């Protein structure tokens, strides 16, 4: 962007275009579905699934005890606050037990072989590939109790069942901070939130720009303002829509954070906010420029989809990054603008990053955003009035380097 381009920027017009973009996009059905209805459906399905999983009043389990453990007639298990009764039905014949599993007379059949003590082998027959965990957990506890009976006291038995109550503390120059399971999930949540936000952003940008090109609204807007003002206004408006969408998603998650008193590190929160904004600006400017070249969503998806797919790379290496934040792959991803917003936040969630790495990564992101804006303005000025069919990557590259 040269000084001439900067002089063409009109804040009032940018804000007017941005406002129009916000109002037109929040009225779209896609926005309502993706922002409110989608999360509500996911939450509803999760609640229904949990209710169905944990609201099991009784389970019938057949067994053939060749070893002679002496299995009780029934066991009552506390299943997330609700009691589930497991009835054990003795079988003398394995084939009869299998038959009853098939006709759903019993939920599962357990066979304890004669050589159980030597092999530790237990055979379970079920109509499902993944048997109910209540059955396997109950059986595991029962076997431990039988094997340890008369050999250890109750205190030792309870410790064998639950060998440790692990507390994790992160160590830094500021001192010690206790970590919880949910606080460890927050950076993972951030990664998926950013991925969803940028994926949603691409859909909003593509549909908005292409729709305006098809309806020739873009030409009317260019009569009102320059291409630079129009692009900045669109980025501002679409970014505002995206942030509104994220704000609504965060509101859905807020009850969980408050209920479980999840501690959010200020250090991590600042990192997440900075890199979220940097990532959002980088992708929004790039997508805006590229989308303007196309007249049909199908054509646009061929070029834009690979850019969105690149984001999956840090998700693929998420475990490596969090287990070993100083791994060379984690560092490389921290310096690539497409992946840095993900990699840096994941690394910062498990370790204190050196200042030089933070400065270098942030500088690369800022420079990349500036380059992205310069490139996108060039594409936008040409693309908004371009109505070519089946635009190829080769043609796009020619447009980029055309003087």
From Swiss-Prot:
GO terms for molecular function: ABC-type transporter activity. Its main location: membrane. It is found in: Cell membrane. This is Uncharacterized protein MJ1024. Pfam families: ABC2_membrane_3 (PF12698). GO terms for cellular component: plasma membrane. Keywords: Cell membrane, Membrane, Transmembrane, Transmembrane helix. The chain crosses the membrane at residues 31-51, 186-206, 238-258, 268-288, 303-323, 355-375. InterPro entries: ABC-2_transporter_component, ABC2_TM. It comes from Methanocaldococcus jannaschii (strain ATCC 43067 / DSM 2661 / JAL-1 / JCM 10045 / NBRC 100440). It is a multi-pass membrane protein. It comes from the Archaea. To B.subtilis YhaP.
């Amino acid at each position: 962007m040269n000084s001439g381009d900067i002089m063409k920027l009109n804040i009032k017009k940018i804000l007017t275009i941005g406002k129009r973009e916000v109002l037109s996009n929040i009225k779209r059905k896609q926005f309502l579905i993706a922002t409110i209805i989608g999360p509500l459906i996911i939450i509803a399905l999760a609640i229904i699934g949990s209710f169905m999983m944990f609201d099991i009043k009784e389970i019938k389990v057949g067994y053939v005890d060749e070893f002679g453990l002496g299995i009780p007639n029934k066991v009552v298990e506390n299943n997330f606050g609700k009691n589930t009764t497991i009835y054990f039905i003795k079988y003398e014949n394995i084939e009869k037990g299998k038959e009853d599993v098939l006709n759903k007379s019993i939920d599962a059949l357990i066979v304890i072989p004669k050589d159980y003590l030597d092999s530790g082998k237990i055979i379970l027959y079920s109509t499902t590939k993944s048997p109910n965990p209540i059955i396997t957990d109950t059986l595991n506890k029962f076997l431990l109790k039988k094997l340890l009976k008369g050999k250890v006291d109750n205190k030792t038995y309870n410790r064998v069942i639950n060998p440790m109550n692990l507390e994790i503390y992160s160590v830094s120059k500021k001192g010690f901070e206790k970590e919880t399971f949910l606080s460890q999930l927050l950076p993972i949540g951030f990664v998926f939130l950013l991925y969803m936000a940028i994926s949603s952003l691409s859909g909003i940008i593509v549909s908005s720009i292409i729709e305006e090109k098809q309806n020739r609204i873009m030409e009317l807007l260019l009569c009102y303002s320059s291409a630079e003002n129009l692009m900045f206004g669109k980025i501002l408006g679409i970014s505002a829509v995206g942030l509104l969408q994220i704000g609504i998603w965060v509101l859905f998650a807020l009850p969980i954070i408050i209920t479980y008193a999840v501690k959010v590190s200020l250090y991590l929160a600042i990192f997440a906010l900075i890199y979220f904004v940097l990532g959002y600006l980088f992708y929004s400017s790039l997508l805006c420029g590229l989308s303007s070249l196309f007249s049909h969503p199908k054509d646009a998806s061929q070029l834009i989809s690979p850019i969105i797919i690149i984001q999956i790379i840090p998700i693929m290496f998420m475990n490596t990054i969090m287990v070993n934040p100083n791994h060379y792959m984690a560092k490389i991803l921290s310096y690539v603008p497409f992946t840095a917003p993900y990699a840096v936040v994941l690394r910062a969630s498990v370790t204190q990053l050196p200042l030089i790495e933070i400065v270098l990564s942030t500088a690369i992101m800022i420079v990349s955003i500036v380059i992205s804006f310069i490139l996108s303005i060039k594409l936008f000025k040409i693309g908004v009035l371009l109505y070519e069919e089946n635009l190829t990557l080769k043609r796009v590259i020619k447009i980029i380097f055309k003087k």
